[in-house]
């Protein structure tokens, strides 16, 4: 049975508890390349300095899924510092989404019926293309006091029926903190849904603890987890086991990806990703074109290219497995779908 299989996996070394794994993340570009047997050429060495712009952070469980000896591995490319980050690209900003509009510290009420709570500032992994790499986390700290203020605001605004836990990464909060937050939300009658956006379940699958899954299962809220997976190689048996646990707990599982040059910028790669996600019980939901954030221009795929890739993707997989192509536009309250330019036949 499922349960037995799960218990067996708990004893393998990779099932170290998530907090231990978090304490042991790799922060040195040199160590990362050494672990992967990748020789640091001039270009890779020059990239080391980019950690001054935004530190390198990668969990070992994620490194284990990278291909040894391949400097162009799609998982490595997402996390390795690159000299291109120093290029000051015109039209790329440090706050592409103009997120300074928080109503109380750590709470953004950008949409009529939903608000975004920045539960935690940090992440388990630093993605080089991150749109919050310049975010002023210090003044939006996830503290019990800020959370209480946010809860008061949510309780006072009956149009809010969905709360989004974001960050940083909201699953950096410990189980007891999440329990407290969920309990507060359950006491507010107009809140129906809790959506959690997290990269932790994919980079450290052990983050999905039995305690957390059973808390979701007991909740009177509908819980939605939006994973952030960009490439099929990220998905392994541990991630699938974590998703199975959440499915049994009644959690709705979605995924959003970012279209990244050199990582997943072709239709077959995206088809493989959709298939691997769906196999794991996760629905592909959004594919974002990159936010124009300083330091990430080298990942950019043009809108025309993106449309071309999507048109091809539609021929490779079932329609329900095709993610929506979208962009976040600063100051716009919600995601803007990109028209694929599909002519009516």
What are these regions (language model features)?
Residues 1-109:
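Flexible, acidic/Gly-rich N-terminal and inter-domain linker regions that tether
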Residues 55-58, 101-132:
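N-terminal pre-triad scaffold of radical SAM enzymes
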Residues 307-345:
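C-terminal accessory regions of radical SAM enzymes
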Residues 130-142:
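Iron-sulfur (Fe-S) cluster-binding segments and ferredoxin-like electron-carrier domains
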Residues 148-162, 171-317:
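Conserved AdoMet/S-adenosylmethionine-binding subsite of the radical SAM
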Residues 62, 127, 285:
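Conserved, mostly hydrophobic/aromatic
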């Amino acid at each position: 049975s499922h349960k037995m299989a799960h218990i067996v996996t708990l004893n393998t070394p990779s099932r170290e508890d998530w907090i231990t794994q978090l304490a042991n993340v790799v922060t040195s570009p040199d160590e990362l390349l050494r672990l992967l047997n990748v020789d640091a050429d001039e270009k890779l060495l020059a990239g080391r300095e980019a950690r001054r712009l935004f530190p390198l952070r990668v969990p070992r469980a994620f490194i284990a899924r990278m291909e040894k000896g391949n400097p162009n591995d799609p998982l490595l490319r997402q996390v390795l510092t690159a000299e291109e980050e120093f290029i000051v690209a015109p039209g790329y900003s440090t706050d592409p989404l103009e997120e300074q509009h928080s109503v109380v510290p750590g709470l953004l009420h950008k949409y009529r019926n939903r608000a975004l709570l920045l539960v935690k500032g940090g992440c388990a992994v630093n993605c080089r293309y991150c749109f919050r790499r310049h975010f002023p986390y210090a003044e939006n700290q996830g503290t019990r006091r800020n959370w209480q203020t946010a809860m008061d605001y949510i309780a006072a605004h009956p149009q809010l029926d969905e709360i989004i836990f974001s960050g940083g990464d909201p699953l950096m909060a410990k189980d007891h903190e999440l329990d407290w937050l969920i309990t507060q939300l359950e006491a507010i009658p107009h809140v129906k849904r809790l959506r959690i956006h997290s990269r932790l379940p994919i980079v450290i699958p052990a983050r999905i603890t039995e305690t957390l899954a059973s808390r979701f299962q007991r909740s009177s809220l509908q819980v939605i987890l939006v994973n952030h997976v960009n490439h099929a190689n990220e998905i392994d048996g541990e991630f699938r086991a974590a998703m199975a646990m959440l499915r049994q707990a009644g959690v709705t599982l979605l995924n959003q990806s970012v279209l990244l040059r050199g990582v997943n910028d072709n239709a077959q790669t995206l088809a493989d990703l959709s298939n691997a996600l769906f196999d794991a019980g996760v629905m592909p939901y959004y594919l974002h074109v990159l936010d124009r954030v300083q330091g990430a221009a080298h990942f950019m795929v043009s809108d025309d290219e993106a449309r071309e890739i999507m048109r091809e993707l539609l021929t490779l997989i079932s329609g329900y497995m095709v993610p929506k192509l979208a962009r976040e536009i600063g100051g716009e309250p919600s995601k803007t779908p990109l028209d694929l330019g599909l002519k009516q036949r």
